[in-house]
Amino acid sequence: MTVTPIDPGARIGHVHLKVADLDRALAFYCGVLGFQLMQRRGPQAAFISAGGYHHHIGLNTWESRGGPPPAPGTTGLYHLAVVYPTRAALADALRRLIAAEIPLEGASDHGVSEALYLRDPDDNGVELYWDRPRQEWPRGADGELAMFTRPLDLPALLAERELPARQAAELEG
């Protein structure tokens, strides 16, 4: 069977999550992670974004208001992943989690990326990560991608800071 690949310009536009409590979900996604509320439809739905896009995440209580999370061992969403543009931006996200006392379930270096894993208030898995530049991705002797999973050095990540614009401009020459 010959399969025609998807257009390389295609991407995931958004994820829509069922939540038990819309205000609690907004407090986490907007208050802790820093997403912007783009539109709220009363107590039942909200659309949030990074960078002014119409929405990256939809949140709704249409079928889930007051409900429990899915039972372990059932099918469904494993996690949603939020990509940050720089390592320093991921470090800022980690600082937000620490300040909000949100526990991590894991923190991994995958060679191609560095990632933090946690749960939202509705027990949905959330990954926060940044991608290393492609030229730094690990490759095997055959040239194939050689991802791995190692513990992420959180103190080193927390030491990461965005350079002030003036300082960055001086370094660029």
Show where each model-derived region lies:
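Vicinal oxygen chelate
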Residues: 1-6, 11-20, 68-173
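Hydrophobic, helix-prone linear segments
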Residues: 3-16, 30, 41, 47
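Conserved beta-strand-loop-alpha-helix junction that forms the acyl-donor binding cleft
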Residues: 19-21, 52, 110-112
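Amphipathic alpha-helical segments
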Residues: 21-36, 96
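Short Gly/charged-rich anion-binding patches and loops
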Residues: 24-25, 43, 92
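Short secondary-structure junctions
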Residues: 34-40, 104-107
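Conserved short beta-strand elements that form part of the metal-binding/catalytic scaffold
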Residues: 36-74, 125-132
